[in-house]
């Protein structure tokens, strides 16, 4: 298993064995919530479109793809001397307050803050300031030099495209029939006390989940793209994503101050239920599923001569 260069709460490295059988075959994988990029690193699609609303995350990935050795050279001294609260807060002030900071320098600082902050949490205040406290590490955090190089190699070999934007804008790049979508949005809370659902500077609410489910259906019906999602296993999740076939899994939670108290939680992997004939949810008006989405798909099949040998037309 290839490890992420970041510490990332909710990262998929631990559940890749369960997730991989559900990821569809396609030429290109589109991820509107790339996060720690474990799915990218541990799959074999020819191309990738990887997006997130967090500009610091996408900046890091772009710089690692373009300038991996420079990122390593700038980050190494930060890791060598920065394992104290005082150094961390000073570097956080530089990250938040220095105008004109070069992209590669900001990328190196973001990597440092992620690895030295509290449990890899990435959090901002409403003004966009990074506000994660120091993590109080007993030993110096791991410097992911090998992971940086692995990421750069994979990103360049697959010509990965990194986009900074909302899931709505990311899904607009869907233009072909050889693309699959995997979505790992901020999880719906399992309780009132477990409500970490931040999406960069704003909460990712139930309303956003409903919008996401609707847009995924629309993209599938328009292009036939297969869709897979991950989320917490709650009644709300099952109601919002009822068009998906949900597979239950157990996952070790990682956002906790005490590793001994981290318990397994129920999650779901959702695979959009589609017609085997046309690959669309609810059908695309093909002979297997009947009229559901208008005449476009059926007429295209007729025009292409799909039924000529059957003597129907």
Please name every model-derived segment.
Residues 1-14, 22-25, 68-182, 186-196, ...:
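SAM-dependent nucleic-acid methyltransferase catalytic core
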Residues 22-80:
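Conserved S-adenosyl-L-methionine
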Residues 33-38, 147-148, 231-235:
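Short, polar loop motifs at secondary-structure junctions
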Residues 209-252:
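Conserved Class I SAM-dependent methyltransferase catalytic core
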Residues 245-274:
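Class I S-adenosyl-L-methionine
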Residues 269, 285-288:
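The −1 position to Zn-ligating cysteines in a subset of zinc-ribbon hairpins
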Residues 279-285, 293-296:
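Cys/His-rich microdomains that often coordinate metals
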């Amino acid at each position: 298993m290839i490890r992420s260069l970041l510490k990332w709460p909710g990262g998929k490295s631990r559940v890749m064995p369960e997730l991989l059988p559900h990821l569809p075959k396609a030429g290109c994988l589109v991820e509107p919530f790339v996060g720690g990029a474990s799915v990218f690193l541990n799959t074999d699609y020819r191309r990738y479109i990887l997006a997130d609303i967090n500009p610091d995350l996408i900046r890091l990935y772009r710089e690692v793809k373009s300038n991996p050795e420079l990122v390593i050279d700038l980050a190494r001294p930060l890791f060598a001397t920065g394992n104290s609260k005082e150094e961390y807060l000073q570097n956080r002030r530089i990250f938040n307050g220095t105008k004109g900071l070069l992209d590669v320098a900001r990328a190196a600082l973001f990597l440092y803050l992620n690895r030295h902050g509290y449990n890899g949490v990435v959090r901002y205040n409403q003004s966009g300031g990074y506000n994660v406290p120091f993590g109080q590490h007993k030993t110096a955090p791991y410097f992911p030099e090998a992971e940086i190089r692995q990421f750069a190699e994979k990103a360049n070999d697959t010509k990965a495209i990194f986009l900074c934007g909302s899931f709505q804008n990311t899904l607009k790049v869907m233009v072909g029939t050889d693309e699959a979508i995997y979505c790992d949005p901020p999880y719906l809370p399992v309780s009132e006390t477990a409500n970490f659902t931040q999406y960069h500077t704003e909460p990712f609410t139930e309303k956003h989940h409903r919008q996401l489910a609707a847009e995924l259906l629309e993209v599938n019906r328009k292009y036939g793209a297969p869709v897979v999602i991950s989320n917490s296993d709650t009644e709300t999740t099952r109601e919002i994503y009822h068009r998906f076939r949900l597979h239950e899994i157990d996952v070790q939670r990682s956002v906790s101050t005490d590793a001994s108290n981290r318990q397994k939680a129920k999650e779901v992997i959702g695979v959009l239920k589609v017609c085997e004939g046309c690959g669309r949810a609810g059908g695309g008006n093909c002979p297997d599923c009947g009229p559901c989405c208008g005449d476009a798909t059926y007429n295209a099949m007729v025009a292409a001569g799909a039924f000529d040998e059957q003597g129907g037309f």
